[in-house]
Amino acid sequence: MFTKADKNKARKKRHLRIRKRVIGTTIRPRLNVFRSSKHIYAQLIDDATGVTLVSASSLDKELGLNNGANVEAATAVGTLIAKRAQEKGATEVIFDRGGYIYHGRIKALAEAAREAGLQF
């Protein structure tokens, strides 16, 4: 009998491969994205010191979202993370899609962050 491939296990393997090459620095931090079934999260991480500089998620009260699992929520989170990053002085980042396919919510978050001023 055939077993169904575990999508999350494959995503984690992809993410490990990506993380070998994608390293954030103080000058150019890593924009990490995590997508759950109900929400989306983004962090700017300095891998040299292991510190999260800023974060944003669809759970943030300032966004006031009813549903955090759609493209509109991802767009709002992308705009918010870009605004917070610019307040901290980070304009250039390295995008870490977390092993997810660049499509849908991940793409919406990335494009919103670019439109709000982040360069990657």
Swiss-Prot record:
Keyword Acyltransferase: no
Lineage top rank: taxon: Bacteria
Name of the gene this protein is made from: rplR
Function: This is one of the proteins that bind and probably mediate the attachment of the 5S RNA into the large ribosomal subunit, where it forms part of the central protuberance.
Protein name (record): Large ribosomal subunit protein uL18
TM region positions: none
Family named by the database record: Belongs to the universal ribosomal protein uL18 family.
Protein's organism: Brevibacillus brevis (strain 47 / JCM 6285 / NBRC 100599)
GO biological process: translation
GO cellular component annotations of the record: cytosolic large ribosomal subunit
Subunit composition and interactions: Part of the 50S ribosomal subunit; part of the 5S rRNA/L5/L18/L25 subcomplex. Contacts the 5S and 23S rRNAs.
GO MF, one annotated term: 5S rRNA binding
Classification via InterPro entries: Ribosomal_uL18_bac-type, Ribosomal_uL18_bac/euk
NCBIfam families according to UniProt: L18_bact
